[in-house]
A protein has these predicted regions:
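Non-catalytic helical tethers at domain boundaries
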Residues: 1-169
C-alpha cells in the first residue's frame, strides 16, 4: 500500500494513462459496434484492458485492476466464441462506462476507491449472460431471451435433443 505522498505523486500519471487507455477502449468498442466480429478490435480491447489492469496494479488500485481483469476474461471467451452480439456490446459499454467513472473517483490523496464491488459484479454477470457464458449462482436472475422455449421436464430424450442442438450452434 502506498502512503499519501507516494500516491499523490503517482496519481497524475495513473489518471492520465488510464484515461488515455479508456479512450482507446471506447474506440475499440465503437468499432465492434459497427463490425461485431472484428478480431482486431477485440484484440485491441483485450490489450487495453490488460494495460488498465497493469497500471492499476502499479498504482495499488486493486478494485479497478480486478474489474478490468474480470472484464477481459469474459471478453476473451465471448470474442473467441463469436458471441459479441448487440446486447452483449451494450452490456460491455456499460461495464466500460463504470470502469471509466470509477477511475475518476479514485481519491487523489489516498488512491482508494471508496465503493464496494456490487455494481461491478452485477455488470460482469450481465455481460457474461449476454455472451452466453452464464452467471454466478448466488446472483439474482438476469432475464435472457432464449431462442428455444425451455421446458421444465428433463427426460433423457429431451436432454439428448438439447445436446444435439447445442453442438449444432
Amino acid at each position: 500500500m502506498l502512503n499519501g505522498n507516494e500516491w499523490h505523486q503517482l496519481h497524475g500519471d495513473f489518471l492520465s494513462d488510464t484515461q488515455h487507455l479508456m479512450g482507446r477502449a471506447d474506440e475499440c468498442l465503437s468499432h465492434l459496434e459497427l463490425i461485431s466480429d472484428d478480431k482486431d478490435a477485440v484484440e485491441c480491447l483485450l490489450g487495453t484492458l490488460q494495460q488498465i489492469a497493469g497500471k492499476s496494479d502499479a498504482a495499488h488500485v486493486q478494485a479497478i485492476a480486478s474489474f478490468a481483469r474480470q472484464l477481459r476474461y469474459l471478453l476473451y471467451f465471448a470474442g473467441a466464441a463469436g458471441r459479441l452480439q448487440p446486447k452483449a456490446l451494450i452490456s460491455l459499454r456499460q461495464c466500460l462506462s463504470l470502469l471509466s467513472w470509477q477511475i475518476e473517483l479514485v481519491d487523489p490523496l489516498t488512491g482508494q476507491l471508496p465503493l464496494d464491488d456490487t455494481e461491478q459484479q452485477h455488470l460482469l454477470e450481465q455481460f457474461g449472460c449476454c455472451c452466453g457464458i452464464g452467471q454466478v449462482e448466488s446472483s439474482p436472475a438476469v432475464p435472457v431471451e432464449w431462442p428455444v422455449p425451455i421446458t421444465s421436464v428433463h427426460s433423457d430424450a429431451a436432454l439428448g435433443e438439447r445436446a444435439e442442438r447445442s453442438s449444432a450452434l
